[in-house]
């Protein structure tokens, strides 16, 4: 009995599992069987592998071939197993050195001509292989720069199956081939090249944006068209600090699976920015798809900003899918074959008009909407969703005074410096805890540090008694108050900080 063995990696969400690929060749009627819980796309590998082997100048073994993907309990999908199946088959047939291929991880899709095509998710797959103790990895040449980002990985990039077989001792030539380029759908966007200095007026909205950046808070802006909501949202990523090394690896892994990562620039070190159209489906926001689940816009915005312009125009199903990541910081995709988890700890920015026609506030043309239309328009933004949004402000039309050439607004650099200082204070206060920003801190932890003086939170007590705030809303106001204190350089929030946080929570209404 001749066995060929090598390794591959199966991805489920961001979690990678090393798979042993075994090929058994028996002297029987020629056949090719693939076992070990492969899906339909992986079952097609039989024909691709056979065509690639013969196109590479190697003889196809005229025997009964059984390829096992172990452990069989793990689901396997996608074309990334092609190279490992081909190498195991050639090793079992004695066409290459079996010992050389054993213990090496092989990732890549095979074309019918034997060329290696790049696959998605190479970064988390290689990271999982290295974590399991398998440092040597063979990938398509187009994926080699991405695989090399994993510390400790010994990466070999190949253009064709013939090159891989030749390196393992096959008696064939390995001619140069035209490489298959990477197929990036749309390179992940970091902070847009925009500055707050371009935003005229809007002092309250600018302050809310600074507070959101400093504390990691979610933000709702309501205002007529042209008031600057989109401009403000696009400038939020520019106020956020760079990602840490661990965050950069995690964010890059998400975009690697999504196919939106260009490895030329290295790890993604700036917060990503996602702004899906209001016609987006729940699957495009949450993720999913056939075969290997792919992250949606919410996961691609991990450690960055998810901006939903014209939020009431999104379907109710889409808006309700946001509740899980807002509460838990991850998205869970349930399949019959397993559960895929993607991180989704983003800052949500919602923008909405005051009514369907958009002229509900300000001067000029009168609003043409009936009260029922207004109620139905905002009913999409449900109470449970808005209850999770810490900052809710009105963005009013800009006055003529804001257009005065002598009035100069602060730049993003100045505001970002204050944000960085506030984040440093939070990091010191939250050292030794699992939280990084005020927006993540539980209410009980904050209330303990306010002390027993109820006068400090008397405004919150009245708002709670009058039904203006839920208990979750009280905690959200306290989080914003701590952020205001951090921006001001104080050790803790004062009563005026809590009052201002309450105004920022209730679109300027406070206890009125």
Predicted regions span which residues?
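Peripheral, non-AAA+ core regions of ATP-driven protein-machinery
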Residues: 1-220, 224-227, 334, 492-512
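Basic, amphipathic alpha-helical bundle interface domains used for macromolecular binding and assembly
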Residues: 35-46, 59-61, 68-78, 293, ...
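Short loop/turn elements that form and flank the Walker-type P-loop nucleotide-binding site
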Residues: 60-63, 100-101, 133, 151, ...
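Catalytic P-loop NTPase motifs of RecA-like helicase/translocase cores
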Residues: 113, 308-315, 358
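Conserved alpha-helical scaffold flanking the Walker A/P-loop in AAA+ ATPase domains
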Residues: 210, 266, 271-272, 283-306, ...
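Walker A/P-loop
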Residues: 221-262, 328
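The Walker A (P-loop) glycine that initiates the GxxxxGKT/S ATP-binding motif of P-loop NTPases
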Residues: 223, 287, 310
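Walker B catalytic acidic pair
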Residues: 303, 309-310, 321
